[in-house]
UniProtKB/Swiss-Prot annotation:
Organism, scientific name: Bacillus cereus (strain ATCC 14579 / DSM 31 / CCUG 7414 / JCM 2152 / NBRC 15305 / NCIMB 9373 / NCTC 2599 / NRRL B-3711)
Chain segments annotated as transmembrane: none
Subunit structure comment from the entry: Homodimer.
Binding site for ATP: D6, V7, G8, N9, T10, N11, A12, V13, T132
The protein's name: Type III pantothenate kinase
Length: 262
């Protein structure tokens, strides 16, 4: 059984794969202040709830865009699982040809998504990941990672509205009954949702025009389903794209180490 861990700025998503299939997954808040023991006890409870234990896990891979948390997570893996985790970063074999000016600047989550997207859906491809920041990644027909776009996530946009406009309340981000709001809450819901949908459609349209291709558009992340239901540019929603990519990277690197006799 392989344990995969994707650490984002707001949430961390954990999963266990058995024989190539995602058996279970969990989401928890990213906490930069937790120790390896606190993370260890939390993961222990999650595993035990599914009838699993640390001993059932034979390999671990971690992707993180929050560097300060990595020390605690690596110590947790070594102390409780007795396994040194594979970390997505320099030295890991991805199979990607990254055409960024500085490939090291590409976030681990974007690399993992690209690996999974190419394997599952082919190329050319645009991957939209709705996280704390929303990222757009373009992979051309030759399976080269060409770059992308980074924008504030929908929650950051909403937080800016609450914090800068004193009389506006915090609201649930959901589809309103009509575009034209009849009260403050519905007007805000409409503005946040449809404003963001417009951003997604505009950016995807411009990316396609610049690429002079019709790449398939894959969406992932917490709000992918909500946005895709209101947009005509998203072809597929895959909520577990990142976890699948982590598993694929683990298998690729484990097989390479086996071939080298390590």
């Amino acid at each position: 059984m392989i344990f995969v861990l994707d650490v984002g700025n707001t949430n961390a998503v954990l999963g266990v794969f058995e024989e190539g299939e995602l058996r279970q997954h969990w989401r928890m808040e990213t906490d930069r202040h937790k120790t390896e023991d606190e993370y260890g006890m939390l993961v222990k409870q999650l595993l035990e709830h599914e009838g699993l234990s640390f001993e059932d896990v034979k390999g671990i891979i971690v992707s993180s865009v929050v560097p300060p948390i990595m020390f605690a997570l690596e110590r947790m893996c070594e102390k409780y699982f007795k396994i040194k985790p594979l970390v997505v970063g320099p030295g890991i074999k991805t199979g990607l040809n990254i055409k960024y000016e500085n490939p090291r600047e590409v976030g681990a989550d974007r690399i993992v998504n690209a690996v999974a997207g190419i394997h599952l859906y082919g190329s050319p491809l645009i991957i939209v990941d709705f996280g704390t920041a929303t990222t757009y990644c373009y992979i051309n027909e030759e399976k080269h990672y060409m770059g992308g776009v980074i924008t504030p996530g929908i929650m950051i946009s909403a937080e800016a509205l609450y914090s800068r406009a004193a009389k506006l309340p915090r609201i649930e981000i959901t589809k309103p009954s009509s575009v034209v709001g009849k009260n403050t809450v519905s007007a805000m819901q409409s503005g946040i949702l449809y404003g963001y949908v417009g951003q997604v459609e505009g950016i995807v349209k411009r990316m396609k025009e610049e690429a002079r291709q019709e790449p398939k558009v894959i969406a992932t992340g917490g709000l992918a389903k909500l946005i895709s239901e209101e947009s005509n540019v998203i072809d597929i929603v895959d909520p577990f794209l990142t976890l699948k990519g982590l598993y694929m990277l683990y298998e690729r690197n484990a097989n390479l180490q086996h071939e080298k006799g390590e």
